[in-house]
Amino acid sequence: MEKQFTLKKLVIYLSCVFVALILLSLLALSVSSHKTVAAFYGISEPNQKNIQAILQTTSIKKNKKKEAYHFVTLDSSVSLKKALKAAGTPDLLFIYGGLNADYAASVSAQKKAGFTTDILNGMYSNIRQTAKIEKNKVTAVPVLVDHYEIDVQRAKFESSSISQINLLSDLEEFARIAKSSTVGPVIFAAGNDVELINVFGALVEAVSGRKAVEAGIEKIRKTVSVGKTSQSSFYSLLLELTSQGGEWHEAAELLKHWSKINILPKNIYQMQKNDVRAFLESNLSVVAFMSLSDHRSLKRDIISRYSSSFIPGTAINVERNLTAPVIYAIQMKKGKQAHSSVILLADSLQTSLCAKTGLAPVQKNCPTPDIQSDDVRYLVAASGVPLPMLSESAFTNKPNRTAFAEALRTILKD
């Protein structure tokens, strides 16, 4: 009986040891096969794929094997804070500048995962100033520059009596001339909430300057902070901003005027990006407002008919702060792989990154793939510190953007 009991204890002991060994093996396998996680928030699918392709080349060797990245797309319909709570904190985050990027930079600072300021070496000064720095550590590193632009149909422009489009009045005159041969001379995706907000924000800067943009943003943030996020609340705020004497009055009046003289199509506030693409493909418009990212998404045989430029203002020789959204790489946790990758992306891989994405570099001297990305670099460098997208600097989630955009459409249609 005693022998049986001893044998039973031995079997139990050996079983426990066996289970422990299995658990240790699984843990070791998990650690050895861990992939550094790179996440994307609010970055278009084409830009994600192109950044991923370059990022994967930066993988460092571990146990004689390259440690590949694991990629995650975060839910950008909610705030970044909520998205991270749902998906977990990645090692590395790519994000456009704005409120959510500010939050990510604060997380990086808490984790003490930033970079020394020499990571900004070689960047043009206006871009260096967009970097997020806390306690002498760079927590948000600029790696690419997007840009809100106008695309002008060359054939119609060259056959017109307009020699240059230096001012919005030149653009309007060109559109008037082209009105008889087009359905809508001037277009943008005003049915898309984000595009409406961002193009409108870019126009506010163009006609009223940076201070007007920032004053409006401050009022929006205060409204949101007290929970007034309904369409009617935003409508009341926009009435104040766009009324005579309001910070955004001139931009709103400009779009209303363009609608009145029929250089915007009648369905402008229903137009989506696909509609803009169709109009350009069929030569139904001569000027389109869009981002460089969207410019790159168009087929070459379509966009080759158009020349891109910055959105002009109402006066020459006035300092501009162009709406040129910066994409940041933010290290969210300490780790050799992510740290090494960001250093490469911000410097030696700039040419590859720009060639793959078609966006502008942050380095002042690196070669660029074509004239568009080089022009954006030059324009931003020659202007004041670039502004982020209004949709990102004023809001953190989709519901608030949607409510605001609906209120803005109502204002602009009045």
List the predicted regions and their residue ranges:
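Short helix-initiation/N-cap motifs at beta->coil->alpha
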Residues: V72-K82, S169-D170, K266-E281
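Paired acidic/hydrophobic, glycine-rich loop segments that form the ligand-binding mouth/hinge
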Residues: D91-I95, S285-S291
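Extracytoplasmic/periplasmic solute-binding protein
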Residues: F174-S236
